[in-house]
């Protein structure tokens, strides 16, 4: 979906709500998952209505995911709390494809890495309302000025936007700068957004539209990563090509770029927390760059031991997962794929690794052959460090 289409439907919503909604959508699309949409406006209105919407019920104190190997509990590692709910109301996290083989944009993880520990972070931008918080005014302004320098442009004026608190106006959530032909916004959660007035034309040799092939998309993304290399700061740009279909079978791309880094763990972290997405209009012009940096205000808690993908699969089948889908996991035969990555929502108190399972939902099968794959999360951290390991009963409050 194009930025201008969203704008028409959502121009009256609070900035903080819109930012978190857009952030969630971009994050899930990057991994090949998107929020299943009923309509353009309804896709985002769940954020407004979530306090009243029916949310998936989680039954606590699920089975202890004890690894088969001996367990030594490190007292220096604090217990972690999983999010109570993953959205609800107007949709759920899933992807619509004709076949799982079309899934793209997945994590750089693979089982051959044989990872035994991964870092966990306290989310410094944690906010149950989804409003950007975390960095102070000076740090936000510093990032804004650095972005302007990277774009070789001069800031003409700035606007300050403040978050809301129960007692009134809160700290600065966003600073927006006006420059020649563009607007640059820096957020308290570390994000940067650049909007080009009227769209920035690309060389004619590049095709930057939803109906572009993977090869055409690769070419334009590498071009954009090079053109805006100072802004991105990526030493080894890697592509995450993804997208999904509408109910009628129209394909929409949702590609992104991240830094491959110097190791597999660094690649997974950058893929999950530090990535760039480029948005075009119907003419194939660049209208927006969105650069995420969710670890900008996070604090590392330590490296936690993790389970294997096979152990996670066992937990999935036993019901120890969290999901925004309104269906109980239908069974082992419907598990279509798995990847290891981090969730990066501002409504998560901790950033920890999960095994993200793509599960075919037979209830959502369509006559035109499209299948919906719901996303089911199993925490990768040993269960002994999870304070509220869940079991989802498929019901609603």
Regions inferred by a protein language model and the residue ranges of each:
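Preferential activation on post-signal-peptide N-terminal prodomains/segments
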Residues: 57-232, 239-247, 251-268, 273, ...
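Generic recognition of cysteine residues
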Residues: 7, 35-38, 44, 275, ...
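Internal signal-anchor transmembrane helix that establishes type II topology
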Residues: 29-56
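A short, surface-exposed beta-strand/turn
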Residues: 184-201, 265-293, 363-397
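Disordered, charged N-terminal biogenesis/targeting segments of membrane/secreted proteins
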Residues: 1-31
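Segments that shape or occlude catalytic/ligand-binding pockets
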Residues: 220-355, 359-366, 370-371
């Amino acid at each position: 979906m194009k930025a201008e289409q969203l704008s028409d439907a959502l121009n009256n919503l609070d900035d903080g709500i819109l930012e978190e909604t857009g952030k969630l959508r971009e994050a899930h699309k990057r991994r090949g998952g998107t929020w299943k949409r009923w309509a353009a406006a309804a896709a985002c209105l769940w954020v407004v209505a979530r306090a009243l919407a029916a949310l998936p019920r989680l039954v606590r104190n699920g089975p202890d995911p004890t690894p088969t190997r001996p367990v030594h509990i490190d007292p220096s590692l604090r217990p972690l709390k999983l999010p109570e709910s993953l959205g609800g109301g107007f949709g759920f996290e899933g992807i619509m494809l004709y076949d799982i083989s079309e899934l793209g944009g997945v994590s750089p993880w693979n089982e051959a890495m044989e990872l035994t520990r991964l870092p966990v972070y306290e989310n410094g931008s944690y906010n149950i309302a989804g409003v950007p918080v975390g960095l102070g005014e000076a740090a936000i302004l510093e990032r804004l000025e650095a972005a302007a320098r990277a774009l070789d442009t001069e800031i003409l004026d700035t606007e300050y936007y403040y978050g809301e608190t129960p007692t009134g106006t809160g700290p600065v959530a966003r600073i927006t700068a006006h420059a020649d032909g563009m607007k640059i916004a820096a957020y308290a959660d570390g994000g940067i957004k650049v909007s080009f007035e009227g769209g920035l034309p690309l060389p004619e040799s590049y095709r930057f539209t939803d109906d572009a092939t993977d090869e055409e998309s690769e070419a334009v993304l590498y071009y954009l990563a090079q053109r805006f290399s100072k802004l991105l700061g990526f030493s080894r740009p890697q592509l995450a090509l993804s997208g999904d279909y509408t109910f009628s079978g129209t394909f929409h791309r949702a590609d992104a770029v991240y830094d491959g880094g110097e190791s597999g763990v660094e690649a997974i972290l950058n893929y999950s927390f530090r990535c760039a997405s480029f948005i075009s209009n119907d003419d194939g012009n660049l209208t927006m760059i969105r650069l995420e940096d969710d670890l900008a205000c996070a604090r590392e808690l330590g490296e936690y031991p993790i389970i294997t993908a096979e152990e996670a699969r066992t937990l999935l089948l036993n019901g120890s997962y969290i999901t925004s889908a309104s269906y109980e996991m239908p069974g082992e035969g419907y598990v279509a794929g798995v990847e290891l990555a981090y969730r990066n929502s501002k409504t998560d108190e901790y950033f920890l690794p999960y095994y993200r399972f793509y599960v075919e939902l037979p209830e959502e099968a369509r006559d035109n052959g499209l299948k919906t794959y719901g996303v089911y999360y199993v925490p990768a951290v040993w269960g002994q460090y999870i304070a509220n390991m869940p079991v989802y009963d498929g019901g609603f409050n």
